[in-house]
């Protein structure tokens, strides 16, 4: 299970190393340095250089709306560097009604044996919300 402060960032297109550094910096600034989860809303894909930045950023998890977090030219290397650095990957999120900012994430995967991935029930809590939809 993954629970903790999460930063949601909106981005469309390829995320290069420079953009990844900006995202990490914004996450730390917004969440007062207490963030180990970054979720990317939009049609974004992480390049190998960006994956290196995220891998060094002491993240627990990175998530995206696409079915793969990686750019088409670096699917295996992006997944490998993140996983080798202990960064879990959460793909296929529905963030279309989530504004950028700070949230609390709870992601509870199904316990399956001998698999490289598992479906999970993930939800965000916005402690600043004034009303519930």
Located regions from the model:
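Active-/binding-site microenvironments in catalytic and ligand-binding cores
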Residues: 1-133
């Amino acid at each position: 299970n993954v629970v903790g402060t999460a930063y949601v960032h909106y981005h469309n297109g390829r995320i290069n190393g420079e953009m990844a550094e900006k995202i990490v910096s914004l996450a730390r600034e917004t969440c007062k340095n207490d963030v180990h989860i970054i979720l990317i809303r939009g049609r974004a894909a992480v390049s190998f250089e960006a994956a290196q930045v995220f891998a060094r950023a002491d993240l627990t998890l990175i998530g995206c709306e696409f079915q793969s977090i990686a750019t088409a030219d670096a699917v295996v290397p992006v997944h490998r560097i993140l996983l080798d650095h202990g960064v879990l990957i959460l793909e296929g999120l529905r963030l279309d009604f989530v504004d950028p900012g700070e949230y609390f994430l709870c992601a509870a995967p199904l316990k399956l044996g001998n698999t490289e991935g598992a479906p999970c029930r993930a939800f965000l809590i916005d402690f600043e919300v004034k009303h519930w939809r």
